């Protein structure tokens, strides 16, 4: 993807987002495979033809800026921070993932997310859980034990006024702009996520042999997915 800076915004902003768009042969990230596969493959195939201006990438900048700040924090002796893992599947493709923190004592993988308040109101956590589950699966391939995951969220549009209104109406609204949600994993969950990963990459391997117009269209669920959130 070609990132432009038509409005001459500060160079650090441009550098921040421009470093995000790199593709490797036969390798896709945990986040990427949650997208519609046709969109994923066509974006990779035609990346040099796609253009986006830094002025339209506020959501990405917010998320990256948050991670840059948290990178400076000191991890504990039982913690692994900002680790990048890659695992090769039997078909020669690789799945990668970069999680924010793993705590060996808690046997928990953790990630930081920026989101809209609607994410919490609708409790729409399926994509978060699946992404962290893939990270957990990658960790188990490196002989780490993972029993749960934790999402630490930062709500960008949280409003104290809306919170008070929701209280008066008896409606749910998150009490704070920063919080966390947790999920636990069973052995059966790891069997299922491995099956999902293998099937996903087998589909990718098949689709990459097809012409653009021969690749099946994304499912309705996939079309609603937008990378870090559901539209």
State where each predicted segment sits.
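An active-site-proximal "capping" alpha-helix that borders the catalytic cofactor pocket
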Residues: 128-140
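Short, surface-exposed linear patches
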Residues: 54-56, 131-133, 173, 206-207
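Short amphipathic alpha-helical segments
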Residues: 58-66, 131, 189, 193
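Metal-dependent nuclease catalytic regions and adjoining charged, substrate-binding loops involved
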Residues: 1-7, 138-231
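Metal-dependent nuclease catalytic cores that hydrolyze phosphodiester bonds in DNA/RNA
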Residues: 1-109, 116-122, 126, 140, ...
């Amino acid at each position: 993807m070609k990132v432009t800076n038509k409005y001459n915004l500060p160079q650090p902003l441009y550098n921040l987002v421009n470093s995000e768009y790199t593709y490797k042969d036969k390798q896709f990230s945990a986040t990427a495979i949650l997208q519609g596969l046709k969109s994923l493959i066509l974006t990779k195939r035609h990346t040099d033809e796609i253009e986006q201006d830094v002025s339209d990438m506020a959501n990405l900048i917010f998320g990256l800026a948050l991670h840059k700040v948290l990178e400076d924090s000191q991890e504990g002796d039982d913690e692994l921070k900002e680790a990048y893992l890659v695992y090769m599947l039997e078909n020669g493709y690789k799945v990668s993932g970069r999680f924010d923190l793993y705590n060996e004592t808690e046997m928990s993988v953790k990630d930081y997310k920026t989101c809209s308040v609607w994410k919490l109101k609708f409790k729409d956590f399926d994509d978060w859980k699946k992404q962290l589950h893939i990270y957990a699966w990658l960790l188990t391939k490196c002989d780490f034990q993972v029993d749960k995951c934790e999402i630490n969220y930062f709500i960008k549009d949280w409003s104290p006024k809306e919170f008070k209104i929701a209280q008066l109406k008896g409606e749910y609204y998150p009490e704070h702009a920063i919080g966390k949600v947790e999920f636990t994993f069973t052995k059966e969950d790891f069997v299922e996520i491995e099956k999902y990963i293998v099937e996903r990459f087998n589909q990718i391997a098949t689709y990459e042999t097809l012409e653009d117009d021969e690749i099946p269209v994304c499912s309705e669920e996939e079309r609603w997915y937008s990378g870090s959130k559901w539209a």
